[in-house]
């Protein structure tokens, strides 16, 4: 009977007693809900349902604590919570699950989840039944084995009821965990096992990125140890760069299928592929500058030449010089072609010698270009002579087309091919000669279906030159207008929209969309072309290709790069050409004829040329025409050039007469033409086996063509930008946009990943104590910041209350009484009551020293070491108040009213409540100010009050200090722990930390100068409202009420 009576005590803090009172409250609310019709009184029903769910939360929270103590490691694992969204893991999740289980057990269904509700209904019924059994057994234990205010359970394990409780808790724990997984999975999307593993790999990528950034000096270890907020933006940005070009086989491998990517980066797959293509064209120095830019947001240094950014556009004088130089090179090319055709039977040694010398020339030119030397110096080398095939590949050689070697092997193909392509071209020729020849080839290729008109038209070349020059000027002007400079007011959403052609064409320079649609057609054409070539003829053509200067440095450099990467090579140095055969044959389009390739076969060559252009595709036409006219003498070569110009001129007139076939010369067409020609040339260079021409080497040729296509696309991607600075700026916008979008779309996942990364990469000295040390100097003001401990362990840093609007002294924090909520008084209230009471007795020093000792003891318990010297400052303040005590008589009534507003009339009660608060408070409390020390030392004495000090106090009284959020893990009224969703709120009257429910009142505080309503706790609101009502109603009783504190202190 004694135990039953004691269990009714509200101040018992044992687990069983707390469960008993919570369960009784829940039962009372449930009974009241059942006592009336909710449809008749909806407001009352809503209010009671809210109370019911709060009580359910409290009962399940206490039950969970009991299970933690009794079951321990035998509890059912809840590792599945790692797959839940962070927003689901709230403190009231258990209450929501209980409420949902009762609704499902009663026959209700989740909205739009009828099938899932039907499946969960048996489990919900089992959960509610098991929970009811646990509540009955726990209530019985409360009456049997409760120990008042015990921190642990004292159960009789030899009792059968205790054993029954133990088994019931295990069953309920298992059922509740199973129901939690089913219910949450039906309500919100839950990660699959693969998605969770991919998120872990993303965390590994972030950690590796941070370690790499620390190693190369982009970040500092002190930033990691201090949890620098800037790292939360820098690490995801750097991780995107590292995942695309450094850790290419990691979770950001864009070659894997889209459904295998992490759900965080799956929406950005297209833009990440384009970013990767651009990153592969950056040199090591450019990549480092981009990563530094992503960390610091500094401006790009345009004074330092990076890669080829210092190369400027050519002047007209340079264009003229380049034209003459190119003509000389063509002459040299023709002479060398004739000499090579006459010595084609010299075997493979000659081919090896010429190839090796060409490789050396390429290396010299690449080094020469990367060192920003003279732009025309390499044009005089015979190995760099231009052919139409080479011109078509280097048509867009802008100043940014020559990056240095790549930091990773995965992008060496693109970078080497790009460097080889542009190293053979003087930069002064980037706008005139290259595009001239390219457009000529394009126009010739578009005349395949007009053989008869081709023979009839014989206009001169001047009109063709003028037409092509006009077209090229229009193209260059369009390219300049559509260059990659950023639009100032364009947001990230507009940049990522694929429908906006002016942005997406130049946003990231990738030609996947252009070449993707023609990939199947190109492969079919290549296969047909390979089937038409005979093995012996192809070997002879390969021998010719080795001897031709038209193969030039770009092809050889690409072949050399592919050989280093163990990829299919187009070099046939190991092939032995027949030395006895002095004539090489070329397969005619009909497949039945072969004609000798000599200087005396001009007419046959011209006739077959037209039949060839009539029957073959555009790319095959370029290939065969290229091989024919380079194996004849110089006059014949000039004759073919004249025919080609006439064909172009004919196409010009044909275009004007047939408006139904508009002539579209644009950048995409030129690049597609270059792509087809490169692929066809590379495809033709692959040696076919003698037995089966379409077997394994055909697949090797296709693989080589794909590699070269990738290199060309990466090169043409960079050509969209005018300078390296513009390219880096655009990459910064793209990468930062994707990383910052993760902060919005996947905030919870990103927080979990970054939290793990910080914990992994912290220095060992920071692992022990993460909390921010408190400031110890009195002159320094305390500005609250969310502690890292809250951010990491409680996930509460980002959702805590805002920083204090006032700068607060650490000495001004108050002492709160949390357990005795009905009679809570702060030391700040005591300060307000007694701050102007002066000492008149002889035991001033004794009381002052005792108060100072008490203050120092409390301060040291909080780590505030500076309060030890506050006794001297208190003596000085007391002397100043003694000098002003004669001036306080006129404001006595105002001071008495302020005493009434505090809610306590006895200083001794304030002292006792403060000491009780110091003993019972669950949080670390802080000491008072100098004025509070003086007020505490003045207890038990009489005083007089001067008007000036009271007036100054009434007008300049500062608000009480706020308890730091890190010192208050629970609400100071209801003791509910704070979480990411239960935020902290400070009372402006007492400075305490409360939850939103306990601090939902607002009232003006004129004594602090706050005339508008501000947030106050419930108890301060009651006191303030009561004082505001009593102050005008009882003006005549002010003197009597004010005399009571003095009488009490005198007694």
Swiss-Prot record:
Polar residues: bias regions: 371-391, 518-528, 583-596, 692-703
Comp. bias regions, Basic and acidic residues: 360-370
Annotated residues for binding of Zn(2+) 1: 971, 974, 995, 998
Annotated segments matching region Disordered: 305-440, 516-552, 566-703, 837-968, 1028-1051
Keyword Repressor among record annotations: no
Annotated GO MF terms: zinc ion binding
Purpose of the protein: Negative regulator of epidermal growth factor receptor (EGFR) signaling.
Name the UniProt record assigns to this protein: Lateral signaling target protein 2 homolog
Species of the source: Drosophila mojavensis (Fruit fly)
